[in-house]
Swiss-Prot record:
Domain notes: The two conserved Cys that bind zinc constitute the zinc-hook, which separates the large intramolecular coiled coil regions. The 2 Cys residues coordinate one molecule of zinc with the help of the 2 Cys residues of the zinc-hook of another Rad50 molecule, thereby forming a V-shaped homodimer.
Listed cofactors: Zn(2+)
Pfam family, one: AAA_23
Binding, Zn(2+): C502, C505
Protein name: DNA double-strand break repair Rad50 ATPase
Gene (UniProt): rad50
Cellular component annotations (GO), alphabetically ordered: DNA repair complex
Amino acid sequence: MSMILKEIRMNNFKSHVNSRIKFEKGIVAIIGENGSGKSSIFEAVFFALFGAGSNFNYDTIITKGKKSVYVELDFEVNGNNYKIIREYDSGRGGAKLYKNGKPYATTISAVNKAVNEILGVDRNMFLNSIYIKQGEIAKFLSLKPSEKLETVAKLLGIDEFEKCYQKMGEIVKEYEKRLERIEGELNYKENYEKELKNKMSQLEEKNKKLMEINDKLNKIKKEFEDIEKLFNEWENKKLLYEKFINKLEERKRALELKNQELKILEYDLNTVVEARETLNRHKDEYEKYKSLVDEIRKIESRLRELKSHYEDYLKLTKQLEIIKGDIEKLKEFINKSKYRDDIDNLDTLLNKIKDEIERVETIKDLLEELKNLNEEIEKIEKYKRICEECKEYYEKYLELEEKAVEYNKLTLEYITLLQEKKSIEKNINDLETRINKLLEETKNIDIESIENSLKEIEEKKKVLENLQKEKIELNKKLGEINSEIKRLKKILDELKEVEGKCPLCKTPIDENKKMELINQHKTQLNNKYTELEEINKKIREIEKDIEKLKKEIDKEENLKTLKTLYLEKQSQIEELELKLKNYKEQLDEINKKISNYVINGKPVDEILEDIKSQLNKFKNFYNQYLSAVSYLNSVDEEGIRNRIKEIENIVSGWNKEKCREELNKLREDEREINRLKDKLNELKNKEKELIEIENRRSLKFDKYKEYLGLTEKLEELKNIKDGLEEIYNICNSKILAIDNIKRKYNKEDIEIYLNNKILEVNKEINDIEERISYINQKLDEINYNEEEHKKIKELYENKRQELDNVREQKTEIETGIEYLKKDVESLKARLKEMSNLEKEKEKLTKFVEYLDKVRRIFGRNGFQAYLREKYVPLIQKYLNEAFSEFDLPYSFVELTKDFEVRVHAPNGVLTIDNLSGGEQIAVALSLRLAIANALIGNRVECIILDEPTVYLDENRRAKLAEIFRKVKSIPQMIIITHHRELEDVADVIINVKKDGNVSKVKING
């Protein structure tokens, strides 16, 4: 592909908000730190050429916070200049292609098609040819032969045929499984034929029984109609009898209620008359009692007003007695004090005592300070001795501590490696355990049987759906019948209660016509009940079938879960085995690193422990030395000694005991004077309080005296009231009784009302007694006998039960016939399916044989081998052309059919492993360029390498840079890298760096 990149512009493409890059011929190095946005440049080139693939999300390329993206790419192919513009804004995308400055394609699909034609490659071939992925060269050097073959096959697209081969294998297996299932089903054909013959015989027998039961049913129906007619006559007689009985009960209840009402009226009248007489006898006593109550209330009200004054007077009297006692005690205390003669000079005496206490306290504090300073001098002498004894150990400790820092760092690295090793070993054990467990769990799962069961359940679901539809229809019919039954019952109830007019047509009706209508509707009702029972029976049978099917269908979820579980576990096993391989490789690498941390046969952690042991031995001396030096540096020894001399001059002749005795004496005198002062103040306050209380008490005396007089009068009036209270209560109860009866009847002139009401009720009682006599006469005329009715009803019920039993037998036989017919139809259909399966088996057998032949063509020994043979000489040719540019002392590079590289040297044939590091890189790069040329079919003019130096050590990076310098056959080589070594070989350097979240580009020619 003779394409040369010339320029790209990016607006809002990932971290490139506004970047423009011109590409020159030669080696172009795009250099920047990881995450700077250098790889995004190639992504923009790829997007410009091939656009958005399937399931592409523009949010992945648009700069965060922006809504649009714009990429413009200029390139040259076969002397023609092309410009592609791709943009996307707010949900709408667009593309344009220009050839030599003129529009060439203006829609996305047209541009995509034109680019494929111009370049001669699609997006996948582009990636496999001119674009060399990150670390691909370094990785190729470390691959095993089988992995190298796989990698080259993938680049050439041969692996797609292997995928077809594998996929067709899966398809063949599916068809083979289908064949096995068909053969399994055909094994049942003979059984179905025998079962069909048996069902036909059973159907013939059932039809004979149905004819017999129909004859029996007709006979019983005639007998039932005769007994039903007689039964209906007695039912009508019972209805009429019960009607009059109910009316008789109603009249008796009404009579009883009226008699009760009469008794209550007579009782209330007597109560009113008696109450009037009692009130007239005791009128004077009642009025006097009410007058006394009013007077007592007034006195009690005044007493409540005076009570607080009365209580205050008593309280103040008590307080006077207490204060007089307190004054006597205070005077007695003052007369006993030793300072009673100096009462006027107490404050002067107190100040002198306080000054003396302060002087003695100062001497006491100086004595304590002197003691502490002498102890401090002793401490200084002690720490001087410690410094001399511990200095040698302190210096040894510092030497060991320096070593400990060095070995501590090594030990941390060593322990980290050990922990990694332990973690990896644990992961290996866990993975092996999990793999074995998964293998054990899947061993007993028969996946083929599960799939067969799931297909059978799908068939049962269809049967269930049909049954449920049938049940819904029957339930609708049930609703219609129940509505009709309710209607008939309502008509019957209305007919039983009717008197004179038909409830349906409102025309006049006699008893005979009424009974005729009742019988007609009862017959209709019985027919509906029979129909209702037949439908309910059919619904119950359907529900049994539904329940049976649901139990089978309920197994589906478990089977699906089991199938999913099996497939998941198989996937897990493959994934875990790959992880196990990686962990074992990591373990080998870590074991090599660990050996570097053993010095003279001893691990660094043990050496560190020895050092720590010695440090612990000297640590106490080290700490003592530091503490002593720190303390001696912090104290002023000379100042302390001067202060001692100063204090000794001041406290001469004093000691602690003398200070204590003098202070106790002075403080006792101080307390005595303060107590005397407090008592004098208290006496003054008490005398003042005494005068105040005496004045307050004299103001309360008049009301106190009034309270005592009223209390005496109240007692006298209450005694008179108590003598009249019984008569008052009797009168009150009589007044209340009359008021209650007035409220009860809501009448003021109650005696007249009650007399009139009694006459009215007596008249109503006579009317009810006459009606009861008429009803008894009608009951005698009906002449209803309950025992005779019961006998006829029993005959009716027995005959009806017999009729129902025969109908049920008939229904059972008819149901059996229907089931047999369905079974026969089902078996015939099944046998027809068997015939179709035999034809399908024949077709499938031929088709599987054909697929297997086609599959072998796509296999490794088929078309894949042909492609490898075709590509090998072509790649070998381009390989030698590229390799010859490096001026290495080899005559020829051979490529085997398995894509193994052999280098022919003067002294023999060498493999890639026999070459030096630089020679290996030259071979790998030459092979990669040769594959690109072979894919495109002509000379590659532009190649892009993404991080080719990743995974290479410093030496190999330098050799790769030198190899790039020698490549002359490729006009344009674009290298994306973060290693600065490649700057020396580049013709153009494009530096990419991040400024915040935005990529900035700078070109150095």
